[in-house]
Amino acid sequence: MTELPDSTRWQLWIVAFGFFMQSLDTTIVNTALPSMAQSLGESPLHMHMVIVSYVLTVAVMLPASGWLADKVGVRNIFFTAIVLFTLGSLFCALSGTLNELLLARALQGVGGAMMVPVGRLTVMKIVPREQYMAAMTFVTLPGQVGPLLGPALGGLLVEYASWHWIFLINIPVGIIGAIATLLLMPNYTMQTRRFDLSGFLLLAVGMAVLTLALDGSKGTGLSPLAIAGLVAVGVVALVLYLLHARNNNRALFSLKLFRTRTFSLGLAGSFAGRIGSGMLPFMTPVFLQIGLGFSPFHAGLMMIPMVLGSMGMKRIVVQVVNRFGYRRVLVATTLGLSLITLLFMTTALLGWYYVLPFVLFLQGMVNSTRFSSMNTLTLKDLPDNLASSGNSLLSMIMQLSMSIGVTIAGLLLGLFGSQHVSVDSGTTQTVFMYTWLSMAFIIALPAFIFARVPNDTHQNVAISRRKRSAQ
């Protein structure tokens, strides 16, 4: 890093800025949801869509981000991403209704979808290969700090200012980042193949309408007939994509990926596993505030041990997998996370609040081990010519499953509770108890998938640079 010219180091700072903005926004909103609900006159049970609208948009737009950067140029797309993200933040702060907020969050999601993958692509183009790992470590460090600061900062702003400020703080950062991008970042382009627009649209429609249908009458107020229509449209769109991708060398995601057994198992496990894990960052601060009566700032502080546990475990995941193998690690961490979820609910409802930080720290450790193991299992056996496509599909599935997880969590709250819940009441705690029990069951289910991982899959084979950096 010290051998790089000053111009390159400034460009890396710009990318790191983008990583920080995107990672901060994914966690800062969770703590503010109850306050948003009160301000907008909505039930807290509807506020999961604030998360879903952002994450689902990211999932839909991710496949196009790398192609756009190659076609239009990394500077132009990175600048556009920052501008869209900043405008989305402004519109979020100005929103007077939930529907306005959801549209603004979707605009944020378009910017967020392009920011991180295009940032990775920028690092690949401006840094010599032998310094790539050091450069990526540098630019992703702010992305690790974002989740650490997000919950507490969100709680602090909500408690001592208003929820609008969790979006307003993005505006000066975004303006500085946009100007710096125009002045300092080169506009690399490269020859691209024709974009699979038909496949992209089919996948986008399928993912969006099925997630909307899953939210159902509880969240969107749709009639059973409308929900059935959405399900039919979503299924038809996905089936049409499969027919489109069969024997199509230009398909967005080649079906040849699924000939690799570890990829198929890893992708299925990642999808199911992140549905359960995706519920936790949303449900935990909501439960602490509405179920237990914590202040927004206190609830945000309680999330820090989980992030610290996750960051600390990343250093030894490789040794753990090499020692025990993928199947044992993934089955054990999946069942362990389910038990920890039950432990969190039990200690919280018993009033043992001093134990909660330790439980959340343990949850972060287990979750981090499982995430890292799922990612490497999915990609490690892919041939080089499919590595980039496989990584893109995995990234999309990660975002999609998180949006589905938050949607299911909102559904469970609506199923077990009324449309209006009071803070720290016996009835509310019962609603959360049943929701938490259901979550623990859902979290445990992927263990059946991971149990099918071959016994001899025990070595954590290093992922090539192309696989690590692909979109």
Swiss-Prot record:
Gene3D superfamilies assigned to the protein according to its UniProt record, in alphabetical order: MFS general substrate transporter like domains, Multidrug resistance protein D
Membrane topology term: Multi-pass membrane protein
Keyword Zinc attributed: no
Main location as per UniProt: membrane
Subcellular location: Cell inner membrane
Gene Ontology molecular function: any one: transmembrane transporter activity
Transmembrane parts of this sequence: 12-32, 49-69, 77-97, 102-124, 138-158, 165-185, 197-217, 225-245, 263-283, 286-306, 342-362, 396-416, 431-451
GO cellular component terms, A-Z: plasma membrane
Periplasmic compartment residues: 1-11, 70-76, 125-137, 186-196, 246-262, 307-341, 417-430
Pfam family, one: MFS_1
Keywords: Cell inner membrane, Cell membrane, Membrane, Transmembrane, Transmembrane helix, Transport
Chain ranges on the Cytoplasmic side, renumbered to this chain: 33-48, 98-101, 159-164, 218-224, 284-285, 363-395, 452-471
Superkingdom to which the source organism belongs: Bacteria
NCBIfam families: efflux_EmrB (TIGR00711), PRK10504.1 (NF007799)
Protein family (similarity comment): Belongs to the major facilitator superfamily. TCR/Tet family.
Name of the protein in its database record: Putative multidrug resistance protein MdtD
Species of the source: Shigella sonnei (strain Ss046)
